[in-house]
Amino acid sequence: MSGGAQSPFLFKCSSQSAPRWAKSNGSESQPISVRLHILFFLTILFAVGCNKPLPLPSLSPSNKSSEDVKTETIAVDRLGRTIRFTEVPQRIVSLSPSTTELLYAIGAGNQLVGATEHCNYPPAATRLTRVGGGTLQGISRETILSLNPDLILCKWDSHQPLIEPFERFKVPIMAVCPDTLAELYEEAVLLGRATGHELEAHDLIEKMKRRVLALTSWVDSVPMEKRRRAFYEVWDEPLMTAGPKSFIGEMLELGGMKNIFADATVRYPRISDEVVLDRDPQIILAPSTHRSQLSLEILAKRQGWDRITAVRERQVFLIDGDQVSRCGPRMLDALEEMIRAVYPDKLANVLEKEPIDSKSVRVGDSNEDANR
């Protein structure tokens, strides 16, 4: 070796390295053939020694090869529970449609083996093994276990009783399901890391942020006093709406509307007809997948509702029930539907994406898509 730093893991070759017994004693009486044999032996010895790493046992953490060493991934779910993975999950069961859609959106759809009966998007999700309905009572634990899952994704707010039973079977279970746009971004990263698709998750987030900006860039130019009062009917019996802490309430605000229940302290409060009448919304929005599909006739039959501005002016709109009811990537499609229905002139020049086919339906108008 010549020039540069010497490697500490290699023998250093020099004339001083030769054993004393191997050196010539200067005697001319030794036969030439003997000296040649000794010289040949030393040449071979030093050639091997100079190319053999110095064994340092203290620097070797184990006898395992680098391929045997597994990296541990740590995830913290919505309940603050820590879940550790030494391998990327390949047999995932999702108990929420929004979670299922998010997994497909980040490229982890082929790692799913089971989902609920309500997981209907994308179409590939309908081919997964059904593990029951979305409610706690409707979920089949036996079916889930038969799929030999290495990860179960449940709802943090309604599936908590499932956690302990599956933990007893040593099945990792994470409590997820966001309820704001910011939480959706966080969950995309969480699931991206857990499934080995973190880069795709960040890419999805950036695309969603750009689209939100494109859809809402005009909102700040509308004075608060000119924004339309909106009521979103989550359910009819009992009458429920969306508060500001819910992603639906967030969409109303992003879409330039004033939620008449912006003072609600819970996500989906029960309300009375009298309060709705008193706050007199200019816009009424509801999911198309209502228990009984909303119509002007139904609203007008409610006591006093025929006096509400939105009913009198026929400003009642149905929004795609799946998109508007799931805090997932398609919630931005629902946001666009809302804006197109309420402020139809605002999106003409601001969208960065190809416009979707709007599925919002003005209640009372003739439109076969109302039953989609």
Predicted regions and their residues:
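Short helices/loops that flank or line small-molecule/ion binding pockets
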Residues: 139-148, 168-169, 271-280
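Bacterial N-terminal signal peptides
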Residues: 37-48
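A short, structured surface patch at a secondary-structure boundary
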Residues: 72, 91-157, 162, 260, ...
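Bacterial signal peptide processing site
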Residues: 51-53
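Extracytoplasmic substrate-binding proteins
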Residues: 72, 82, 161-240, 261-263, ...
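His/Asp/Glu-enriched short active-site or ligand-binding loop at hydrolase and phosphoryl-transfer sites
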Residues: 244-268, 288, 317-318
